[in-house]
Swiss-Prot record:
Annotated family: Belongs to the RlpA family.
Keywords: Cell wall biogenesis/degradation, Lyase, Signal
Function: Lytic transglycosylase with a strong preference for naked glycan strands that lack stem peptides.
GO biological process: cell wall organization; peptidoglycan metabolic process
One function term, GO molecular function aspect: peptidoglycan binding
Name by which UniProt lists this protein: Endolytic peptidoglycan transglycosylase RlpA
Principal EC category: lyase
Family matches, as InterPro entries: RlpA, RlpA-like_DPBB, RlpA-like_sf, RplA, SPOR-like_dom, SPOR-like_sf
HAMAP family attached to this UniProt entry: RlpA
Length: 287
C-alpha cells in the first residue's frame, strides 16, 4: 500500500512538473537556428520602473512586449563577466544563449538577426542593460559568436520578441520569421500564428473575416526555382497567393491562405503527388 501511494505521489509530481515547464525545444532541428532550449515559460509581470545612472526605464508587458521588433546596435559581454550574477538571479555563463535588454521581460526570449550576414540566434533575456544610448542589446559570448559578431565587436541587429507558453507554444513578433524557418510539422504547430504571418500582402477579403481559421502550405526541399515554379503552374490555383523562397541550396513554396480546410487538403494531396511526397507543412492560424 505504501509502495502504491509512493508511486502515485511520484506520478503526480511528474505531472505537475510537466505542466509548470514547457517541453524543451531543439531550435536548430525545428527552425535551423541555434539558441536557448526555450524551457522556461514567459511570465508577464506588471511594468516596473527602475533607474540606472540617473536614467529611468520602464519594463514592457502584455502585447507591447510580445509585438516588440526593433533594429539597432548589439554588442556582447566580455569574458570577465563569467560567473557574475545577472538581474534575474542567474549566474552569467558565456557558453549559454542569453542576453541583456533594458525593457523586455526577464525570461522572455528574442530572435536576434545580424543584419550584416543574416545569421540568427535565439536568446533568453536574463539581465538588464546595456545602459548605453547607442546599444539595444548585449549578447552572451556564445550568442554573439553564433551570429558572427565577435570579430566586429558591435553590429546592427534586428530583435524580435518571442514568448513561451506553459504548453510549449510560441508567440510574439518572432513567429513570423520562425514560420518561414520551420523544418517540421511539429515546429510549425508550436507557433501561435496571426493571419499575416506568412504573407505580407494578404487580400483584404481574407483580412476582413475576423475569428476565422486559415491555412497555408509550405513545401520544402525543392531542388530549383524552376521546379517550384513548374509545380505552381501545374496547380493552376485561382485567387490563391503563392511565393517561392530560397532556403540554403534548396527552394520552398508557400501557398495560401485558404479559408476552406477541404480545399486546402485537396491542394496538399495534389501537390504531394506531383512532387513525389517532398516534405510539406500545414500552418493553421486564426485571424
Amino acid at each position: 500500500m505504501k509502495l502504491k501511494t509512493g508511486l502515485n505521489l511520484t506520478a503526480l509530481l511528474l505531472f505537475m512538473i510537466s505542466v509548470a515547464f514547457p517541453a524543451q525545444a531543439d531550435t536548430q532541428k525545428m527552425y535551423g537556428i541555434r539558441g536557448d532550449n526555450l524551457s522556461i515559460a514567459t511570465q508577464m509581470p506588471a511594468p516596473r520602473t527602475y533607474s540606472v545612472k540617473g536614467q529611468t526605464y520602464t519594463t514592457k508587458s502584455g502585447n507591447e512586449a510580445k509585438s516588440y521588433i526593433k533594429e539597432g546596435l548589439a554588442s556582447y559581454y566580455h569574458l570577465k563577466f563569467d560567473g557574475r550574477k545577472t538581474a534575474s538571479g542567474d549566474v552569467y555563463n558565456s557558453k549559454q544563449f542569453t542576453a541583456a535588454h533594458k525593457t523586455l521581460p526577464i525570461n522572455s526570449y528574442a530572435l536576434v538577426t545580424n543584419l550584416h550576414n543574416n545569421r540568427k540566434v535565439i536568446v533568453r533575456i536574463n539581465d538588464r542593460g546595456p545602459f548605453s544610448d547607442k546599444r539595444l542589446i548585449d549578447l552572451s559570448h556564445a550568442a554573439a559568436k553564433e551570429i558572427g559578431l565577435i570579430s566586429r565587436g558591435i553590429g546592427q541587429v534586428r530583435i524580435e520578441a518571442l514568448h513561451v507558453a506553459k504548453n510549449g507554444n510560441l508567440s510574439g513578433a518572432a513567429t513570423k520569421t520562425l514560420a518561414k524557418q520551420a523544418k517540421t510539422q511539429e515546429a510549425a504547430d508550436r507557433l501561435v500564428l496571426k493571419s499575416n504571418t506568412l504573407f505580407d500582402n494578404t487580400s483584404k477579403s481574407i483580412n476582413a473575416l475576423k475569428g476565422t481559421e486559415f491555412y497555408c502550405l509550405k513545401m520544402l526541399e525543392l531542388t530549383s526555382r524552376s521546379q517550384a515554379n513548374k509545380l505552381i503552374t501545374q496547380l493552376a490555383l485561382a485567387n490563391i497567393q503563392t511565393e517561392v523562397n530560397r532556403s540554403g541550396n534548396k527552394y520552398e513554396i508557400y501557398i495560401g491562405p485558404f479559408d476552406d480546410k477541404t480545399k486546402m487538403a485537396q491542394v496538399r494531396t495534389k501537390l504531394q503527388k506531383m512532387a513525389n511526397n517532398k516534405p510539406l507543412i500545414v500552418y493553421t492560424y486564426k485571424n
